[in-house]
Design a protein with these regions (language model features):
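PDZ-domain C-terminal substructure recognizer with occasional recognition of PDZ-binding tails
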Residues: 2-23, 28-30, 90-120
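Generic preference for well-ordered alpha-helical elements
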Residues: 5-7, 22, 46-50, 67-69, ...
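Eukaryotic intrinsically disordered and solvent-exposed regulatory patches
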Residues: 1, 10-15, 37-42, 53, ...
Length: 120
């Protein structure tokens, strides 16, 4: 795992696990501009249409890399993920030609820690 923090964001590098013909990331996503944000349990104001991590498989590549449930995915391998549909996000994450996925995520606990340190 390689990670760094800046203003509430973290970089997470996931090495996909090969299982036969499939490359496994070990996490699921929810959200997207085509989804109802009021159904997103991670959106604090219920208007955020971002892409969020909804499940992380125990012992899988994502957990090993440090990804957490509730992380908001801002970028995938340099691609902006802030205004994409759920299907566009899924396709970007599961590209067969990419064995490593580099994510830029926002984590609520990181955001709160940064905000509190700025107030101190």
């Amino acid at each position: 795992m390689s990670a760094w923090w800046a203003m509430g964001q973290q970089r997470v590098e996931i090495h996909k696990l090969r299982q036969g013909e499939n490359l496994i990331l070990g996490f699921s996503i929810g959200g997207g501009i085509d989804q109802d944000p009021s159904q997103n349990p991670f959106s604090e104001d219920k208007t955020d249409k971002g892409i969020y991590v909804t499940r992380v498989s125990e012992g899988g590549p994502a957990e090993i890399a440090g990804l957490q449930i509730g992380d908001k995915i801002m970028q995938v391998n340099g691609w902006d993920m802030t205004m994409v549909t759920h299907d566009q996000a899924r396709k970007r994450l599961t590209k067969r030609s990419e064995e490593v996925v580099r994510l830029l995520v926002t984590r609520q606990s990181l955001q709160k820690a940064v905000q509190q340190s700025m107030l101190s």
